[in-house]
Amino acid sequence: VYKRQSSLSEPEAELMQQLAGRVLLVQLSGPMSFGAATGLHRRMRGYQDYDVLVLDLSDVPSIDSSATLALEEIIMTSCEAGHTVELVGIRMPVARVFARLGVLDLIRDCDRHPTRLDALRAAAENLGVATLPATDDGEPGRGAVTATSEGR
């Protein structure tokens, strides 16, 4: 979960500013085990003031079944609370575990994106937040308001 935006690309940081705290961005990294997922689940209970949860799994090479079930619980809880869930970068080994445990059925209701920037753009669109026009290089333009991104 992001407390600071230093590890975000410039376009991602600008989008987070435009979204003004309405998006909770959670980036997971490394192999996911039960302990890591339970800790995340516990920490997630402290975050309720958001509209969209972006779960970035791009840096998760593997996941065990107990961590998968904990992630499923996080997604279900978020959806039941009326939040939109955007998933980023699910790798094939992780997708296989999700499929084996039936979690793919749950995440079919979530939008899936190849990159975090794509997920943030989708969140902005879902929230009706006009994003800055793309520059010649395809990246959003400059200028944004303040934001607080929570977490990590």
Where are these regions (language model features)?
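Short, small-residue-biased leader/transition segments that mark boundaries at the very start
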Residues: 1-2
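Structured cytosolic domains appended to multi-pass membrane proteins
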Residues: 7-152
